[in-house]
Amino acid sequence: MRYLITSALPYINGIKHLGNLVGSMLPADIYARFLRQEGEEVLYICATDEHGTPAEIAAIDAGLEVAEFCAKQYHKQKEIYKRFGLSFDYFGRTSAPENHELTQYFYQQLAKQNFIEEREISQFYALDDQRFLPDRYVTGTCPHCGYEQARGDQCENCTKVLTPTELIKPRSTISGSTHLELRTSRHLFLRLDKLSDEVRNWVDKQTQWSTLTKSIALKWLNEGLKSRCITRDLVWGVPVPTEGFERKVFYVWFDAPIGYISATKAWGDITNNDWECWWKESDDVHYTQFMAKDNLPFHTIMWPATILGSREPWKMVDYIKGFNWLNYYGGKFSTSSQRGVFLDQALEIASADNWRYMLIANAPESADSAFTWEQFQKQVNKELADNLGNFVNRILKFTASRFGMTLPEGGTPGDAEAELQVTCNELVEKLRKYLHNLEFRRATETLNALWRTGNQYIDVRAPWVLFKTDQDETAMVIRTCVNLIRLYAISSAPFIPHTTQALFDALQLTDVERRHTMTEASDLTLLAAGRSFMVPAPLFQKIDDDLVAELKAQYGGE
């Protein structure tokens, strides 16, 4: 089996926040790293989502042409994701030629199958701005929940998909003007109504989907699918290859999911790999998507309808890992509202691994979760710095001071070591099971339990006391503990990869040893006497109360 993994495409309109990271890219990366470690063939694809009104609005605010703005943002985002250790096999752009080509191709296939129709619609025209206002160019009050900053394409508060004309008290996002009038314009529609039965049949077969994902898909289907407009009166986007529509582009939610395929094509072209084997005639491919819940309607309904309507054997997703929202002191993390902590800011505060661990430990899997600075402090200090970092520091420093920079000889493992081995084996298998099942909070809890096991062992065995009476027994305890460090490095690798590399280097592991699976690493006798090691710098810096108070004041955490 080969594993295709995609995470929801981060939008180009600004640096993403912690909620974006934990709701798609981070869990996808952890899953990809774990599967690679297990020896599986993995392809992890992502790209920036660059079309639509938010990109144009952000470019206007930045005083740049939209193409220049998107190019700069792409490189900024790509660099930040690299610093966070996101291991994309390819990170592309929906503005790339491959995506233009494939988007137009899918449209033409749908048109051939009579799933596209022209319609004349009424849409807002801003008299003061002298232009049509599609999607997010209109802001107003949501008719469903009353949220006053709802956008013309979707309410970010209740996730309802909207049209601009549904908004109460609509206004131009550009100028704030309420001098709007309805004018007619011809557009192209995807006949979701004609594809409804096929989509429902496909959704009904997805028995492994989570309650969150399945319920959102069924809610849409039960409300009845309506034809969806897939063109916009914009300049920036994929041009519509139809006479009479030369001044229109495709709706961002039509071309964006095609970006998964087009980015794979770009990867294949660059690396001389067969990209089509991942997307066509791909019975041996298991495809998993990662995204937050506001993206689920498009990925469970509109994108599958596009594939089904093409009447071609494109790969359909096998499992969608949907996430709820990460909230920040009473409100959802939001790029458009600039609420919360953004990824560039986060890296100035703490290391990438601190954030990776804390976020995935609190991933909003079954319900919304809340970020607090106190929780961040607790998990960095107690779980990372104490349970892992302090264990490594105590063992390697003690070994260096008493035995030198090689593992000492002597002693034979006894009942305590046998019991420790059984416990570690059980925890490693639980960890692997949870990662296979995409249960990230449980996986992180199990990893922390594995770290605690080592601390409990040395508290009982107390090598610094034992050394005074039995140096051979102490040597055996030390070797066991250093093998625990090796196990911690490998089992932690999907979660905190930068720390893992520091541990690999400290233990001077060979290339083969660094590629061990968690199961292979469970043997607590593998590193034998005579092996060299180094004492690394402290792995984690603790966060004190003064810094927490400062961060709460700076980022509105009250």
UniProtKB/Swiss-Prot annotation:
Cellular location(s): Cytoplasm
Q: Which cofactor does it need?
A: Zn(2+)
Question: What is catalyzed by this enzyme?
Answer: tRNA(Met) + L-methionine + ATP = L-methionyl-tRNA(Met) + AMP + diphosphate
Q: Which CDD domains match?
A: Anticodon_Ia_Met, MetRS_core
Where, by residue number, is the motif 'HIGH' region?
10-20
Write one Gene Ontology MF term.
methionine-tRNA ligase activity
Pfam families documented for this protein? Anticodon_3, tRNA-synt_1g
Q: Name one GO biological process term.
A: methionyl-tRNA aminoacylation
Ligand binding (Zn(2+)): 142, 145, 155, 158
Q: Where is this motif: 'KMSKS' region?
A: 332-336
PANTHER family from the UniProt entry: METHIONINE--TRNA LIGASE (PTHR45765), METHIONINE--TRNA LIGASE, CYTOPLASMIC (PTHR45765:SF1)
Subunit comment? Monomer.
Return the similarity comment.
Belongs to the class-I aminoacyl-tRNA synthetase family. MetG type 1 subfamily.
Protein known as: Methionine--tRNA ligase 1
* Species the sequence originates in: Acaryochloris marina (strain MBIC 11017)
